[in-house]
Amino acid sequence: MNILISNDHAGTELKKEIVEYIKAKGHSVKNYGDDSGESVDYPDFIHPLAKQVSENNEQTGIIICGSGNGVSMVANKYNGVRAAICWNKELASLSRQHNNANILSLPARFLSSEEAIEIVDVFLTTDFEGGRHEIR
């Protein structure tokens, strides 16, 4: 699986740990995010990722900022993008099962790296249930 990932300055360190985890699981990662940790304008880093997901509905993304809100709002402006802010494993599972989320939005200031990696793992391994959720 090829995972797209992006972040602002608040998510730089968490992103590095997530990228390391994803690669260790045998997936490839394309980084659209900030690597400097210097203050940046998050839309500049989220638009390219969201555009890619919008153009390829088989694509999966992870976006990270301090709260998860700003990056999610930018991503969800694109047709076909379903970005979900998740701060626990249950939300990650439901976002995939019931909402077919294709982008995981993480609040870096509210998660440990261990919690974030558990959420990423659930998001990447949970399938959409379809059925009654398909019509939404």
Language model segments and positions:
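Glycine-rich phosphate/diphosphate-binding loop of Rossmann-like nucleotide-binding domains
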Residues: 4-24
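C-terminal binding/interaction regions
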Residues: 4-6, 10-11, 89-135
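Short amphipathic alpha-helical segments
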Residues: 16-19, 73-77, 97, 117
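A short beta-strand-loop structural module common to alpha/beta enzyme folds
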Residues: 28-39
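Structural motif
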Residues: 38-47
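Helix-adjacent hinge/juxtasegments
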Residues: 48-85
